[in-house]
From Swiss-Prot:
Co-factor: note: Binds 1 [4Fe-4S] cluster per subunit.
Function: Catalyzes the isomerization between 2-isopropylmalate and 3-isopropylmalate, via the formation of 2-isopropylmaleate.
Catalytically driven reaction(s): (2R,3S)-3-isopropylmalate = (2S)-2-isopropylmalate
Subunit-level organization: Heterodimer of LeuC and LeuD.
Residue stretches spanning the membrane: none
Annotated protein name in UniProt: 3-isopropylmalate dehydratase large subunit
PANTHER family, per database record: 3-ISOPROPYLMALATE DEHYDRATASE (PTHR43822:SF9), HOMOACONITASE, MITOCHONDRIAL-RELATED (PTHR43822)
Enzyme class, spelled out: lyase
Family statement drawn from the similarity comment of this UniProt entry: Belongs to the aconitase/IPM isomerase family. LeuC type 1 subfamily.
EC number of the protein: 4.2.1.33
Cofactors demanded by this protein: [4Fe-4S] cluster
Amino acid sequence: MGKRLLDKLWERHVVTTNENGLDLLYIDLHLVHEVTSPQAFEGLRLTNRKVRRPDLTFATMDHNIPTKDVWNITDRIAKQQLDTLRANCKQFQVPLADIGDEEQGIVHVIGPELGLTQPGKTIVCGDSHTATHGAFGALAFGIGTSEVEHVLATQTLWQRKPKAMGIELKGKLQKGVYAKDIILHLLSKYGVAVGTGYVMEFYGETIGAMEMEERMTLCNMAIEGGAKAGIIAPDEKTFVYVKGRKYAPRDYETFEKKWFELYTDADAIYDLHISIDVTDLAPYVTWGTNPSMGVRIDEKLPEKHDVNDERAFSYMGLIPGQSTYDIPVQHVFIGSCTNSRLSDLEIAASVVKGRKVKEGVRALVVPGSKRVRDAAIQKGLHHIFEEAGFEWREPGCSMCLGMNPDQVPEGEHCASTSNRNFEGRQGKGARTHLVSPAMAAAAALYGHFVDTRKESYDGAISYS
């Protein structure tokens, strides 16, 4: 019987197996940020250990950074975490993309753009959305702080092998529909626990047509379906993306030959299989307090089915049967490790070019990294956004989570390109609606959600 992509990635990294069936995996890349690393480094100090492979470790600052004035850090805890990471990286000789450095940015944005992320690697980070890197055919997953310490000290991690889920995507997306809508559709149909105990492998003609940055969006949110990771077999688009980047292999051709072996064999069998035809897929909007609580833009909000729905409707200030077009939007956030790359900003800019943000709407664009910001500026995207009435910010996690000054006031609604809409995620009492960059940009213009399939980008729109 053939092997799945998961099998090939896993078997290449098993050092040994213990009596309980746990495998000791070798870790090829350890990404670090300021929030989940302080206790791990302190653990090394207390046991007089060193970082085993600083050359396979890379740190950045992202969660706590103010995006309006990056040097004006007024929160005491945020400043302490940033200062601590800086000191730890210096002591343990770990490479750091510090505030102001050209390589700084959100950890799951800079990994791929610097060429640190490569097919066939095992990649971990003390962050839920490490699955992003799986878009390159890497086995990438989030870990806890105690595991961060274990990897720093040993460059290995004890893990139980997950099962493999195959998700086949068929058909061609309509204009105005994106990878973000695919993953929100998947979650709304199958729930936030469908992937528990699995690694999701996305494949099919739809994947083949996607560029790398859309594939990253898909894998980024695999964790929202409960999956250990999300992976996509590398192809020519993957190889072209990686080649020539700063940390890409120097003997590239040798690595590329090995990467071509990373695919699921034709006679391999998944433990669970799902097939989705995206041809008639519509833009999605989440209405509730987890990513599975979403509907098509042309659907009404659902009826209440249980106490969770009851609580979600109450928290969000919405009612069953309400039209998605009638949901008010006071804030728009285009950013996060899900949708802050150059192609995301280009899509949003194409929506708002020559138009104005609705009066009363606060709209932010936060590039995912310094390199994304610089590339966007070279293309003049910052002018398009600023002329439309958006705030153009510096790179960071920003409004994705309430750990920095970028927050949504209590009781107000935000159209967000991020990945989580939990209660209080964007600030106390904040009401988050997850959407694609195009949907978020259009909501900024109208002060409510509209159908980006019908949005002509010249001011005309149809709601029917």
